[in-house]
Design a protein with these regions (language model features):
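Alpha-helix N-cap and loop-to-helix initiation/capping positions
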Residues: 2, 76-83, 114-121
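A short, acidic, flexible beta-alpha connecting loop/helix-capping segment that sits on the rim
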Residues: 104-115
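A short, acidic, amphipathic alpha-helical segment used as a generic capping/interface helix at domain edges
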Residues: 83-96
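Residues at alpha-helix caps and immediate loop-helix transition turns in enzyme cores, especially N-
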Residues: 25-26, 87, 115-118
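Short, well-ordered coil/turn segments that N-cap beta-strands
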Residues: 7-11, 36-38, 97-102, 131, ...
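C-terminal helical cap(s) of enzyme catalytic domains, especially alpha/beta-barrels
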Residues: 113-135
Length: 135
């Protein structure tokens, strides 16, 4: 807010995933900064299942705790646009109304899936959402 107040000509990019992970509603956040947004990262995520080792978690050993924390931390997974928890049509609409010019599909990890397959899934979902004219 300080930068925006002192540099009104400065535009910036927003990342839908990290806005939401930071505890904010991406649609409201985008609307708040309407007019300053030029680029929106369309990044979705899903909550996976946490694997529980057979026999339970060993909280008494450092190795057991580290394994638990790794599983706990990695329960949030990046997802193809439209395959996760975020309301992508509403995010895109807010971005368009707020002056967004560029919308980038971004997925930090494909978890073994070919990145081009992930990109195709995101593309197909964007088309289904009504944004086929972007391609």
């Amino acid at each position: 807010d300080i930068i925006r107040a002192n540099a009104p000509a400065l535009g910036f990019e927003l990342d839908s995933h990290w806005i939401h992970r930071g505890g904010q509603d991406p649609v409201k956040f985008i609307k708040k900064y309407a007019g300053s947004i030029r680029l929106v990262h369309l990044k979705d995520y899903r909550i996976g299942e946490m694997p529980i080792p057979e026999g339970g978690v060993d909280f008494t050993s450092k190795e057991g705790m580290m394994k638990f924390m790794s599983n706990f931390t990695n329960i949030v997974q990046f997802a193809e646009v439209g395959e996760g928890t975020l309301d992508m049509p509403a995010i895109i609409q807010a971005g368009l109304e707020g002056g967004g010019e560029y919308f980038l599909v971004e997925q930090d990890d494909c978890y073994g899936r070919d990145p081009f397959d992930s990109l195709k899934i995101s593309h197909d979902n964007l088309v289904k959402m009504g944004f086929g004219d972007w391609f």
